[in-house]
Amino acid sequence: MNDPFNDTHETSGPIERDPNGIDPHKPGAKLDAGKVRPSLILSDMARAILAVAEVGTFGANKYTDGGWQYVQDGIKRYRDAMDRHRLLGAIEERDPDSGLLHAAHEAWNALAVLELMLREKEAEVREASHG
């Protein structure tokens, strides 16, 4: 998997470059053209990220910190939870248990599914490369 946070000059992939055309060996150069820009989510969607973090905090307090990662059949079960919150969000705005927005619960579950899928994929790639 590509590491979007890697600031090294790659030689086996696309050549990295400064978005302003500054030579990599000159002061002020930063080889980040074309790299992932986390600020587009963290700054531009700060309210949504905080709402999802509230769901994560609620879950950690109700269960355990990070315990969601060890739920059996997590992808399937978090998908079901995501769908439940989507359906309930059409009927009511807030989850009665947490008092938080169903949309925030839906987003948290979508992120949990995505995280588990990406981890599975990484494990498959690691296994394949180590034979």
Language model features by range: what are they?
Residues 1-131:
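Intrinsically disordered, low-complexity regulatory regions
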